[in-house]
Amino acid sequence: MSLESKAIEDINRALENDDTQAAASISQTYLRDLDSIPLNIAVTGESGSGKSSFVNAFRGIDNRDDRAAPTGVGETTMKPKAYPHPIYPKVTVWDLPGIGTTKFPAHQYLKHIGFEKFDFFIIVSSDRLRENDFKLAQEIMKMGKNFYFVRAKIDSNLLSAEKSQKEYDEEKTLQKIRENCIQGLEERGVTAPQVFLVSNFDLHLYDFPTLQETIERDLPSHKRDTLILALPNICSSNIKKKKEVLRSQIKFHAFTSATVAALPIPGLSIAADLGLQ
């Protein structure tokens, strides 16, 4: 049962017992719980893979922004670095050092970065997947965490393909890249690998919307809404989902305010209304 369904059930039970004060308290607790739900997203990959740019894009931040993860030639990430979402600070995207830069084998790498705190992993590559990527995926599988492969810089890959192919077909090229990645992962024992082709500078193109939907589906319901609100507005379906989440929260705010207003406690309604501003 989702947090929302549980809250509604408890509120209805309180109202059936004519306990409006308990109902209001349940609603307020639910809203507080929503605000405190953390979401920790781990992004890792080899040097030059576009990992830090992906961290910024996922947060809706330009690389030139003061809050952006540093990007550039060479490995700039030497230890896990937290980048909170600019609007939803409980959502944190972690820029992790590439496994090849830590001198730790894959199983020790996960312990080194504190894998337990992450809700899921995104492994970023810019061209072919590296041996370290495969090893890391295998270790994450053993730990029971969800992970997703992102082939970043796909726009650059397509441009190179267009210049080198006599009969260039974008869809066929994308499909070939995707199939090659999946085949390589399967050959190394990764079960049902999920590969997404992404441009860090044009998230609305290629597979980023599908990546979003896949992560949403895999997350528990109480974290799913947190993710939806934090994702960049790259298409109309994103905006629609955000409206639905906000609409759901608004009904709890409205109920809390209306219920508190009915309680014979001087000043309590005003305090509740102020809390909604």
Regions found by a protein language model. Name each.
Residues M1-L96, T101:
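Conserved G1/Walker A P-loop phosphate-binding module
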Residues T71, K81, V91-Q108, F149, ...:
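AAA+ P-loop NTPase catalytic core and its hallmark functional loops
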Residues E75-K81, V91-E139:
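Switch II of P-loop NTPase G domains
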Residues E116-F120, M143-F147, V190-Q194:
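Short glycine-/polar-rich loops that comprise or flank the Walker A/P-loop
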Residues F121-S126, F149-A152, L197-V198:
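Conserved beta-strand segments of the P-loop GTPase G domain that flank and frequently precede/overlap
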Residues K153-T226:
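Canonical P-loop GTPase G-domain recognition
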Residues L227-T256:
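Cytosolic-side membrane-insertion boundary helix
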Residues R247-Q277:
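Membrane-inserting effector segments that mediate pore formation, membrane fusion
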